[in-house]
Amino acid sequence: MSNLDVIEKNARENHVPVMLEDGMEFLVQYIREHEEIVNILEIGTAVGLSSMKMAEIRETIHIDTLEVNEEMYKQAVNNIKENHLENQITVHLCDGALYHTDKIYDLIFVDAAKSQYKNYVEHFYDNTKTGSKFVFDNLNFHGIVDNPDLTHNRSTKQLVGKIKKFREWIQNEPRFKTVFYREIGDGIAISEKL
């Protein structure tokens, strides 16, 4: 078992919010097939698993990854160092909505506060170019977005409503061409900047 496999196993056993396995495989394969993807911004580091898997695709890939939780941040930094990927991955301890940079990214992977997805698009829009992609995870939210009766929790219903509203917005947003992959992971969308 590789070191990344151990990190992934521990994360899943401890309910750390990491991407579902088939969703991660899909994202890695997508980046592998698109060699123009070199500069990546990840919003939501957790323990650094997805960053490390993306960095392993090509040595030319550089990732800025943002994590708001200090414990997760420390664990991610440690995991990245242990896997000798600190030259490719820079972890920033901050809220994604407060991060500012002049960098232009080929891909922005959004896997953070679901209710803030639209704000992240607007906040980082100028950090992209024509052809850059936004990748969004958790757009099904465990199947509840399409079947809201699966929960009776009021705050979950509100969150699901925001995710549904975001899905409709990004699908119809004329600045992007969006493709949904509802059957992969917990629902993924890729929005390409036009």
Task: Go through each PLM region and give its residues.
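A short alpha-helical cap/connector motif
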Residues: 1-107, 114-133, 139-194
